[in-house]
């Protein structure tokens, strides 16, 4: 049975048997049999376990992320022409779900998704996280508390996606965010249409464009830092320096020596990496040549880990070449643009011939009648 069929069968079983099936899969995959929703006492216990210094670091980081994302907010567009009103208004989603993966705890995932959701005006946020020894990571619970998220569930894998999408054991969400393993990804893919999803996150990627001015160790450790995410992670060095190429020629790193920085940019556009660092004498001059990248980090002191944690820019990025057609997570991913119009009688009468003729061309008679019947 391939992964698509495997996930489909589990989702079908959960749809049919509901909470009973979720309990069985939670026991099977996570070894957990207790209540799913995290209690107020567990929130309190988690906060008590966090060192004060870590609390301060988390608060400072959240402020930086919030500051960056508040600048993204768009104003509604409204204008009047010929006595008619036209516009585009933005409405936040009411309820979303955030999947925070297990394995290594990733509290930064909750920060990077939860903050823009709150900035956008999302009122209800649900978090799911696979339990470890029957508990959710205390840092995740502390961040949830700071973001005023009260619904956190000890749920992982396919069953967590199903619970959020179908509204089993909780209210259904409108859209699911957050990375996961191949089973979570496939579950998200299959529930798309029932709910929205952010993206299908793949292995981490980094490409570095560097010339002879780049510090060799800076470049090397930036490349290696992304390979640390897992064996499927990818790293490319695109450089005009043979010396740097030789120094960074390590296992897992694809090294490409180019004749010019322009050629490096061309290669980067073909790769469309999740993260692109440009460490050259004049990195800003190359930005206009980059068309495909999830994020661009310039200069010696903007490594990917800085962006992952404390710069405030979002680290939820397209992978697997998807940067050719989509971009970084923003507040707009949590909002819906809605067009609005109120046309005056005078403008309608003067312009309706456009619609009447187009309806005739398309052969849809009742569209035409809807326009003609108005006098």
From Swiss-Prot:
Substrates-to-products reaction catalysed: L-histidinol + 2 NAD(+) + H2O = L-histidine + 2 NADH + 3 H(+)
Cofactor: binding details: Binds 1 zinc ion per subunit.
Binding-site residues for Zn(2+), renumbered to this chain: 226, 229, 308, 367
Requisite cofactors: Zn(2+)
Chain positions recorded as NAD(+) binding sites: 99, 159, 181
One annotated GO molecular function: histidinol dehydrogenase activity
Keyword Secreted: no
Gene Ontology biological process terms in this record: L-histidine biosynthetic process
Family annotation (SUPFAM superfamilies): ALDH-like (SSF53720)
HAMAP family (UniProt xref): HisD
Family per record: Belongs to the histidinol dehydrogenase family.
Function: Catalyzes the sequential NAD-dependent oxidations of L-histidinol to L-histidinaldehyde and then to L-histidine.
Protein's name in the database: Histidinol dehydrogenase
Taxonomic source organism: Pyrococcus furiosus (strain ATCC 43587 / DSM 3638 / JCM 8422 / Vc1)
Gene from which the chain derives: hisD
